[in-house]
Amino acid sequence: PMAEINNMPATIVWDGKSDVRRMGIGVRHAGDDGASAYRIPGLVTTNNGTLLGVYDIRYNSSVDLQEMVDIGVSRSTDKGQTWEPMRVAMTFGETGGLPHAQNGVGDPSILVDEKTNTIWIVAAWTHGMGNGRAWWNSMPGMSADSTAQLMLVKSEDDGKTWSQPINITPQVKDPSWYFLLQGPGRGITMKDGTLVFPIQFIDSTRIPNAGIMYSKDRGTTWHLHNLAR
């Protein structure tokens, strides 16, 4: 049998002393499309059987927000054997006159609405903060100038194109919290059609908490459930 290592053919030899294991397929590598690193992946299968991988595009380095970071998506229609060119699903460029490196968006989570096949991505957008780490520099409040913003995008064509960002911060954030963001990875659709994403936040006492946010109207409005520490 044959495999590929660094895009070069390689022969797999089995000596009978161990189980044969499949070689992984590298979807994104450091340096691809000029990015220093790709981190924080999530993976879903759409109703059409398409695989969608979501991740941070970390252009300058592998460090966390605040930095020059966008949300990327890779798409496969052959069960992961090959992947289409990367799509940028969420970017804030030079919003507010600040450089791209002070408009990072990252740590995505992805969800397939199994009733409609609409795909949702949620991520945290940080504006300003002087390239300090968002975990310590996001402050209480509601505006982008003071606190990280919780943003959604959606796709209604099986992950080919993505909407403009939708800001749901006013729907779900307590103004006293320092930082509200999603739980990276993926969300779920419950049997009754409720859409659920994991979330995390730093409260007014700077204690990290965990919870979920949910939508019962196909993603039009979002709410937080009982929170847990």
PLM region spans:
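Asp-box/BNR beta-propeller blade signature and adjacent active/binding-site loops
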Residues: 5-229
